[in-house]
Amino acid sequence: MKKNLYKYLAGNDYPGRGIVLGKSPDGQKAFVAYWIMGRSANSRNRVFEPIDGGIRTVAADPAKLEDPHLIIYNAVLTLRETTVVTNGDQTDTIARFMNGNLFPGYSFEAALATRTYEDDAPNFTPRISGVVDMRRGGYKLSIVKSDEGNAESVQRQTFDYPQPVAGEGHFISTYVKNGAPIPSFTGEPLRVAIDTNDADKFADKLWASLNEDNKVSLFVRSIELETGEYEDIILNKYTACLLYTSPS
């Protein structure tokens, strides 16, 4: 049974970072959503910034950045006909493996086999990642996490959806809910309804569902499967303090 993603998020004040991959009800588009949340001032001091083919996280106010470790990274990259989305610098690891075609058909899994969970004890935040075929619409999701907080045991799980159904998607997040330490996501990605063909409406509903205090930024990509062309939407809670330099 498909879950109502908006209700699920509205009832959870801190699922952490989240990825949704799926297909529009008319079957013509693939949707990619990624958001970040934060409880600390350092985690909240971020915005999504567009780059060629994707986004990266940057400090909203560089003067207030305490520690870039784990919070500043490329979150979305486009590799020919593949969108890569992750919650950390494993985006670059996946891109390197896929660009080199090091393990044909399994470069995603092979790349993540070289990575482990984040070193933020006692939470040991999972690394969540996804890839989308921008012409066929198939996708994969992965989570790399500790064994319920046991730093001596890493678990790597990949979920493959080569034939997604129209109006359906899958959702994975770093955490189950708030806590101390924060419990990692468990089980398979949640099967959720994609209820609109309109990316703007999808983004607006997701943004409204995320906890007002803890949400930081949201990214939504709509991909036309017939052509592979895409449009990106970025919503930031905080305004970036941009540093301009004069031309040389």
What are these regions (language model features)?
Residues 1-5, 102-119, 196-208:
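Charged, amphipathic alpha-helical segments
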Residues 124-127, 132, 138-243:
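A two-mode feature
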Residues 35, 40-81, 91-92, 97:
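Conserved loop->alpha-helix
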Residues 1-24:
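Short, extreme N-terminal leader segments that mark the start of a protein/domain
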Residues 90-151:
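Short histidine
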Residues 244-248:
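Conserved small/polar residues in nucleotide/adenosyl-binding loops
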Residues 16-24, 30-33, 74-76, 127-133, ...:
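Short beta-strand scaffold segments in enzyme catalytic cores
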